[in-house]
Amino acid sequence: IVCGGRSDAATRFIEPTLMDEVPLDSPLMTEEIFGPVFPMITLDDEGNSFKDKVIEFVTNREKPLAFYYFGKEAEGWEIIRRTSSGGGCINDVIMHIANENVPFGGVGNSGMGMYHDKESFEAFSHRRSIIATGTWIDLPFRYMPYKMFGLVKKIL
């Protein structure tokens, strides 16, 4: 634990907590986190470019609900373009959730759909496609046997 870590079950309080050197097979890295606990991943910059290591790290795992990148902004944008996540920030955390005008949601195993503002309404709505056909004429080529199919193909 780098900082934080205090909790109080009676008041349901969990202090925002930063954790470093978390094993990649730890539940903190393999399960969704519903609390102010942030595992940090540090990648060395030897060998392949750092940006490529980040992209490889992200794309070799399940798509994250959120992706937070700290580093050069231009590299951050390239990494975001080449990876997939629900949302994210460059050189910040949480702000994509805090803004009610910015949709938030997951992709892949971290969920489907977005919420906040109009997206909340859409997420809990069901849009149906309905086709209404008039009864004044019922074209026989819709039904078997399809004898008139050749004629329809010629017309089209």
Locations of the language-model features?
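Short, solvent-exposed loop/turn elements at beta->coil junctions and helix N-caps
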Residues: 4-9, 93-94
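Short beta-strand segments
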Residues: 1-5, 68-69
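Conserved C-terminal structural/oligomerization subdomain of aldehyde/semialdehyde dehydrogenase
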Residues: 14-156
